[in-house]
């Protein structure tokens, strides 16, 4: 392999160690409104009768699932400041990003999911988001839900994801009107930062002191300005460009 190959491998190992400790690529997905509901489920079960023989009977159970609703609007504002970390003779560029998510949810359309309102468990409603790594967070995360503050706890309830944060809304009554939200995040990362256009209308604005950005993903910026001291970029994306629904059950 030779000396050059060894040097490249050593550099890769050093960079991997730095980014593993600091934070790797950041993917921010959400927020999503989740509301549990109960439903009846019929199944066949074996029942042992008093005389010892087994009969197969239909039984009805009450189960609980979640209905998920995406926002009507989502605005993402992020300031990612970079720095260089060292491991021996090797360097790695990393960033610390302050991210603010704001927007609104429309009243959940349970009828479109064929869910009866009497089966909705409003007190167990929650807002959740997925994030690759929240190790950069130095203070407790807070959700502002129409003026009410709710603490975000570690862990995502979004199907398919585990890392992130979730806030229990503990609603006393059904959501009757549009609900505005805001969440502030403080994250470490390296390599890149990605956001999912989860709303009907999505806007994102990212600024950084990194002078040589590369724009990847399914949507390129609608506006960008790259300078020697950093860059600014903006996106506007509608839900027509995505391949997942506005609501679903799981």
Please give the residue ranges for each predicted region:
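Hydrophobic alpha-helical transmembrane signal-anchor segments
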Residues: 1-2, 6
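Soluble non-transmembrane domains of integral membrane proteins
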Residues: 9, 13, 20-21, 30, ...
């Amino acid at each position: 392999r030779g000396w050059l190959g060894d040097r490249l491998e050593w550099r890769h190992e050093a960079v991997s160690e730095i980014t593993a400790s600091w934070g790797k690529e950041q993917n921010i997905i959400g927020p999503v409104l989740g509301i549990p509901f109960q439903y009846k489920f019929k199944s066949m079960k074996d029942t042992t009768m008093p005389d010892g023989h087994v009969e197969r009977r239909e039984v009805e159970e009450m189960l609980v699932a979640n209905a998920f609703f995406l926002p009507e609007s989502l605005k993402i504002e992020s300031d990612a400041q970079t720095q260089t970390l060292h491991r021996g003779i090797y360097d790695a560029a990393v960033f610390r990003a302050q991210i603010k998510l704001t927007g609104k949810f429309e009243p959940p359309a349970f009828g479109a999911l064929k869910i009866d309102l009497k089966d909705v468990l409003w007190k167990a409603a929650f807002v959740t988001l997925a994030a690759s790594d929240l190790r950069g967070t130095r203070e407790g995360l807070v959700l502002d839900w129409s003026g009410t503050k709710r603490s975000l706890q570690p862990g995502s309830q979004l199907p398919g994801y585990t890392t992130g944060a979730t806030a229990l809304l503990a609603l006393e009554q059904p959501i009757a009107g549009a609900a505005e939200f805001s969440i502030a995040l403080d994250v470490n990362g390296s390599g890149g930062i990605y956001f999912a256009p989860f709303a009907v209308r999505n806007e994102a604005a990212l600024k950084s002191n990194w002078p040589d950005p590369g724009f990847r993903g399914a949507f390129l910026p609608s506006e960008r300005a790259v300078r020697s001291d950093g860059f600014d970029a903006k996106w506007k994306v509608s839900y027509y460009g995505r391949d997942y629904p506005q609501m679903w059950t799981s």
